[in-house]
Amino acid sequence: IAKLVFLFVGLLLFCEMDGQSRWQIQPDQSIEWSIGQNIPHYDHIEMGGEMVATVLRYGVNADGTFSLERSVVWPMLRTIPNDTHASLTRRFSVDFLAMLQVNGLTLNNEQVKSIRLDGKLTVVSEFTVGHTRGTKAGGELVPAIELTRVFFPSVDKPMLCERYTVKNMGNEKVEVLLPHSRVVYQTKSDQGVDGSYTLVASTVVGKEDVFLLGSGESITFGASIQAYKRGQTELLPNIDAEFSSRDNFIKQVWNNLDFCSPDTTLNTAFAFAKIRASESIYRTSGGLMHGP
């Protein structure tokens, strides 16, 4: 209860200071930032599941591009010395989107349109496609692709999940080539209670990786960052299933212990405090434990 009250007050102060000029409360209790002239701006959001926690340091640069660094924490992968801070923690700035190809070309000239928080971080951007900064021979910059990124922790698995939806905004068909990427890191064995840990940052793409999208059509692929110890195996993520599980968890939290007042800012601050207090419960070897 004490943590819930503390989070409630903190989020209320945040909403009061920043919400009027940047974040707008939506009918579904989420908050959304429609990107205008108030950039650059940077912030962070902490989220968690039973076996992973993350701090997403995100923002919009002065040129309208998205900025992201992920801090990922695995509370059950213990490091040495095994004290209260001994969770395996790593930062990642890998750009899975940079490997995507549209008509054999990369995406250029990103302009972030909106950022939404609702227990997930959702970013909607528009891109051009072309040779020189999105143009051929100095042609006009015309948005061709809408890209929606969603970042969220798995509810019950040791991984951070990412969901990418590519939509054709143009009038002509485009060929989209999805990337197969897998990067593996191995920690030093003398730094872990259980020896060396394996970290994997990879895209999640089905058997088909080339798609022809007509006007208004879209395709979705995923990515994940996970870690495991000896005796465990790498997970094969189902990003859509993980997305649904996270959504269901948020809905359950928001529908229980509701706070109603004439002030929508108070109601929203309480709703987000409930998420943070409920999600930071980890499934340790000694049972469920509420993280600090």
Q: What are the roles of these predicted feature ranges?
A:
Residues 10, 14, 255-258, 264, ...:
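Intrinsic disorder/low-complexity segments
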Residues 19-269:
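Terminal accessory carbohydrate-recognition/targeting modules of carbohydrate-active enzymes
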Residues 1-21:
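Bacterial Sec-dependent N-terminal signal peptides
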Residues 131, 260-292:
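Extended glycan-interaction surfaces of carbohydrate-active proteins
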Residues 3, 149, 246, 274-276:
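Basic side chains
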Residues 16-19, 160, 276, 290:
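Generic hydrophobic/packing signal
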